[in-house]
Regions:
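A glycine-rich (often HGG/GG-containing) alpha/beta subdomain
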Residues: 2-4, 18, 70-74, 82, ...
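Catalytic strand-loop segment that frames the active site of acyl-thioester-processing enzymes
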Residues: 2-39
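HotDog/MaoC-like acyl-thioester-processing domains
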Residues: 3, 14, 85-115
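Generic preference for hydrophobic/aromatic residues in regular secondary structure cores
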Residues: 8-11, 39, 62, 78, ...
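N-terminal auxiliary interaction/assembly segments of multi-subunit proteins
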Residues: 27, 31, 53, 57-60, ...
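Surface-exposed loop/turn and secondary-structure junction residues enriched for glycine/proline
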Residues: 31-32, 36, 42, 71, ...
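Active-site helix/loop of acyl-thioester processing domains in fatty-acid/polyketide metabolism
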Residues: 38-61
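Hydrophobic beta-sheet segments that form the core/acyl-binding groove
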Residues: 61-63, 67-98
Length: 115
């Protein structure tokens, strides 16, 4: 199930940088956490997978994730930039002066018809 246009929307794209905003009224924030909502880490990783799949124009799934670090919580009212470099993904503020999360990932194409 895609999170795009439900939990987040893409608002700009510039090469390997994708800017997005979250939907603060999404039901996930009622439970994570009710009085102090933050974007779940699993969702941040899934969004990266969706963005990369769209960029490659083929379905993929991450097979390994390493060096996953959350430096600062991301709240639903924040805009963030996903920066994709080789196998490293960073989630930062729009002017790229603060990195909120980062990880390395390897992936596999999940479409058996794609070589």
């Amino acid at each position: 199930m895609s999170l795009r246009n439900k939990l987040y929307e893409q608002i700009a794209s510039d090469g390997n940088r994708i800017r997005l905003r979250f939907n603060p009224s999404h039901p996930i924030f009622a439970g994570h956490f009710p009085s102090n909502p933050i974007v779940p880490g699993a969702c941040l990783v899934q969004i990266a997978e969706e963005i990369l799949s769209e960029r490659l124009n083929r379905p993929i799934r991450f097979t390994t994730i390493s060096n996953l670090k959350f430096h600062q919580p991301i709240t639903p009212d924040m805009e963030v930039v996903y920066q994709l470099n080789e196998n490293k993904i960073e989630i930062a503020n729009p002017d790229l002066t603060a990195v909120y999360a980062q990880f390395k990932a390897t992936y596999l194409c999940t479409d058996p018809d794609v070589q």
